[in-house]
């Protein structure tokens, strides 16, 4: 029975991949006739081996001379280039050599060598990809930006676009044309080890920031990526951020409506913006690995949207169908499943056996030449759009702004706008100059902690070595307040980076900062997490470490006021120490300029404007998102079944304080009664009633009062960030289409139903009414991204 079951599963994948799916949309990226002509010419003359090679991606270490590289610095192996490119015609390489960032000159030298080999052996350029996910993370001396979760906290689309544009420029300075970014997974489970890579828990924020990043990376024309731009790769398609266990790469159980309405939304928006590639979720949903899901890969993405971009696997995920997920008996069978499901390129990353397996499958009739040609066309199209056939590499002398002060200023602004003030009792902040400050905690003097993963290395563990030109929190406070006014006693420290256990802490020395407190006017305690990335970041307890919490409790006993600084990639449970602090600042992972940004904010030289991009839980069994269902937050029910359900959170989504105050008034709309085709134009007056200038993120929410499927508590629909001088009032305009208030019903169809809605902006509420029900018969609403 087991074998019969497997045969049915595989034949379903193989058979349906050849079934035509009706196109319901014009090409989401305009077709370039010249590029398509070139592709047809190549497909006619390429051998099967050459075609399959284009579908294969190998990590750089395979073609490196590792022994020499470890002694003298990174260099390639001509013998392995002969095998990988000469024999197997491999069309893509990825990753960072020796596991650490390289100088742009070293990148350019290596990629020139690779491209010369590829053009000589195949006549087709190689495409090289790296994970530059928060700035130029793998190019030394480049500009690092805050991690995605911080950029979400800025609620600043333009800042996200500028950051991606700078990252593209500096990535291209090393002749790298492809970045595996942005990350638009929804960070809806605080336990998840990759929560910090995306823009937060909300699908609209991820969609807006993802679109902004694509604009910055790729420029305006997806068919002609300029010399200062790169191809974006949206990841991880999709639903990666909600594993049932909370652990990375473990199964999810996502409803069809949530998949379409929320998890698909950022990818839909980015593809409509012209995103050229997508990387697939490594996990399993409702029993089926995403890499094997033809419906999601081919139908939803390629056919329904008429998208001609490239789908690439994540690391070793074809083999995982055999070795981990057990839906394939052999690795060869796994190749068959994923290629027929719609994968175009395999991030193998070590074995060229993928090429051998796929050739055999084609010769056996298990994978059609039609599917091969479609995949290869997508690879070639990406290379033509990048201009690689004309310029396989670039003159790095053109990139004279690399690592410039101009770029650094943008990164500093991003860090300042991303750090969130959560508590400020008695206006203890800002801290006046001349105060004696006791600085404590394991995160107070660490570039590794400020940066997080994907920073100079996968786990970010070498950041203290590679980021010495930048300021830790301690160094930044010394610069701001004078070293003579900073007393540094960490009390708790992390184990050496040579220890594989990122969470491990040394024996605490709490007595030292407690003794030093007598000399201080105020205590700043920097707590949180050490750096980690992906599965190594899995944990079993979301509560902050006992050592760190005990440090705060001991310091509180001194009677000196405490400012807690939370430097972490996910919200660790701290409910027992929050009441002990006068102020709390959540800086998350602000990267190389995060220490300077914090010093500016604590001193009042900059004003807080960040807002929470996720819901911060108070208890481990009270994990929730802001768009929860009504039954998750109920008062006590009387009778025999006497129970209640409470949303017990520490800080809500969208929350953030400032050194000034904002008053909202005059919320209005042009059409209080509307239908799906109407444009709704909301206006609201926002006044800075305080004494200092500030920036305010104006968030517009909707609440569907009654629907045929249980509606969410509330949903974010638009946002704008405005700058206001003291006493200044601005009228903020926020536009929606009536169809933006639609939802996906139990039947999987988009629907907007007659009935009442409430709109919220700041403390302002208003009522609007939909007077006409509409049900879409297309998979996606036919409304382009705003």
From Swiss-Prot:
Compartments it resides in: Periplasm
Which keywords, in A-to-Z order, does the entry hold? Carbohydrate metabolism, Glycosidase, Hydrolase, Periplasm, Polysaccharide degradation, Signal
Cited Gene3D superfamilies: Glycoside hydrolase family 3 C-terminal domain, Glycoside hydrolase, family 3, N-terminal domain, Immunoglobulins
Q: Which residue spans traverse the membrane?
A: none
Q: Name one GO molecular function term.
A: beta-glucosidase activity
Which species is listed as the source?
A: Bacteroides ovatus (strain ATCC 8483 / DSM 1896 / JCM 5824 / BCRC 10623 / CCUG 4943 / NCTC 11153)
**Primary location class:** periplasm
Stated pH dependence: Optimum pH is 6.0-7.0.
Protein name, please? Beta-glucosidase BoGH3B
Signal peptide positions are: 1-22
Main role? Catalyzes the hydrolysis of terminal, non-reducing beta-D-glucosyl residues with release of beta-D-glucose in xyloglucan degradation, leading to remove the backbone 'G' units.
């Amino acid at each position: 029975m087991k074998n019969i079951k497997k045969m049915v599963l595989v034949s379903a994948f193989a058979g349906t991949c050849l079934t035509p799916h009706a196109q319901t949309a014009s090409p989401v990226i305009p077709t370039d006739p010249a590029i398509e002509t070139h592709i047809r010419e190549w497909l006619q003359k390429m051998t099967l081996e050459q075609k399959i090679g284009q579908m294969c991606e190998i990590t750089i270490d395979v073609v490196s001379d590792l022994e020499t590289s470890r002694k003298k610095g990174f260099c390639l192996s001509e013998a392995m280039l002969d095998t990988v490119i000469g024999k197997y015609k491999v069309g893509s390489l990825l990753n960072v050599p020796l596991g650490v960032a390289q100088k742009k000159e070293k990148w350019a030298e290596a990629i020139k060598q690779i491209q010369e080999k590829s053009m000589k052996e195949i006549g087709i350029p190689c495409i090289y990809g790296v994970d530059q996910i928060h700035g130029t993370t793998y190019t030394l001396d480049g500009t690092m930006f805050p991690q995605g979760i911080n950029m979400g906290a800025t609620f600043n689309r333009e800042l996200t676009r500028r950051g991606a544009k700078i990252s593209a420029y500096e990535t291209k300075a090393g002749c790298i044309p492809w970045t595996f970014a942005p990350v638009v997974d929804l960070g809806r489970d605080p336990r998840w080890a990759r929560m910090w890579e995306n823009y937060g828990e909300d699908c609209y924020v991820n969609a807006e920031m993802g679109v902004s990043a694509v604009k910055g990376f790729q420029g305006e024309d997806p068919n002609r990526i300029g010399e200062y731009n790169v191809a974006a790769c949206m990841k991880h398609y999709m639903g990666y951020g909600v594993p049932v266990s909370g652990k990375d790469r473990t199964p999810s159980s996502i409803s069809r409506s949530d998949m379409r309405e929320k998890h698909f939304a950022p990818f839909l928006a980015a593809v409509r913006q012209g995103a050229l590639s997508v990387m697939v979720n490594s996990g399993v949903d409702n029993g089926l690995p995403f890499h094997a899901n033809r419906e999601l890969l081919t139908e939803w993405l390629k056919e329904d949207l008429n998208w001609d971009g490239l789908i690439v696997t994540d690391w070793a995920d074809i083999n995982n169908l055999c070795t981990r997920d057990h839906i394939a008996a052999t690795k060869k069978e796994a190749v068959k499943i994923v290629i027929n499901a719609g994968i175009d390129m395999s991030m193998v990353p070590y074995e060229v056996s993928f090429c051998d397996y796929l050739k055999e499958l084609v010769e056996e009739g298990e994978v059609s030449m039609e599917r091969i040609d479609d995949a290869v066309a997508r690879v070639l199209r990406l290379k033509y759009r990048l201009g690689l056939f004309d310029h396989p590499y670039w003159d790095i002398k053109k990139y004279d702004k690399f690592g410039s002060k101009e770029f650094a200023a943008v990164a500093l602004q991003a860090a300042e706008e991303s750090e969130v003030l959560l508590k400020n009792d008695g206006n203890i902040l800002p801290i006046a100059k001349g105060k004696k400050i006791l600085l404590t905690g394991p995160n107070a003097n660490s570039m590794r902690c400020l940066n997080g993963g994907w920073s100079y290395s996968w786990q970010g563990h070498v950041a203290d070595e590679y980021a010495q030109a930048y300021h830790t929190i301690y160094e930044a406070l010394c610069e701001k307040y004078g070293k003579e006014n900073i007393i540094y006693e960490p009390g708790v420290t992390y184990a050496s980076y040579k220890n594989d256990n990122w969470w491990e802490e040394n024996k605490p020395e709490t007595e030292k900062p407690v003794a030093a407190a007598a000399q201080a006017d105020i205590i700043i305690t920097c707590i949180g997490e050490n750096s980690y990335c992906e599965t190594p970041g899995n944990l079993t307890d979301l509560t902050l470490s006992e050592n760190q919490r005990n440090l705060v409790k001991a310091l509180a006993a001194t009677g000196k006021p405490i400012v807690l600084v939370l430097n972490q990639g996910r919200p660790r449970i701290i409910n027992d120490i929050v009441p002990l602090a006068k102020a709390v600042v959540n800086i998350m992972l602000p990267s190389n300029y995060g220490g300077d940004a914090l010093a500016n904010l604590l001193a009042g030289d900059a004003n807080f404007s960040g807002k929470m991009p996720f819901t911060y839980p108070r208890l481990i069994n009270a994990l929730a998102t802001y768009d929860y269902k009504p039954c998750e937050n109920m008062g006590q029910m009387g009778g025999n079944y006497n129970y209640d359900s409470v949303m017990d959170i520490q800080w809500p989504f969208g929350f953030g304080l400032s050194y000034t105050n904002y008053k909202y008034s005059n919320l209005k709309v042009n059409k209080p009664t509307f239908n799906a085709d109407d444009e709704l134009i909301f206006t609201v007056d926002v006044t800075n009633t305080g004494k200092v200038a500030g920036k305010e993120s104006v968030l517009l929410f909707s609440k569907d009062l009654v629907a045929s499927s249980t509606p969410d508590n509330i949903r974010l629909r638009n946002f704008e960030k405005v700058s206001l001088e003291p006493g200044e009032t601005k009228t903020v305009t926020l536009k929606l289409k009536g169809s933006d208030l639609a939802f996906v019903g139990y039947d999987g169809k988009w629907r907007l139903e007659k009935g009442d809605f409430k709109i919220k902006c700041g403390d302002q509420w208003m009522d609007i009414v939909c007077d006409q029900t509409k049900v879409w018969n297309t998979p996606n609403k036919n409304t382009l991204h705003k």
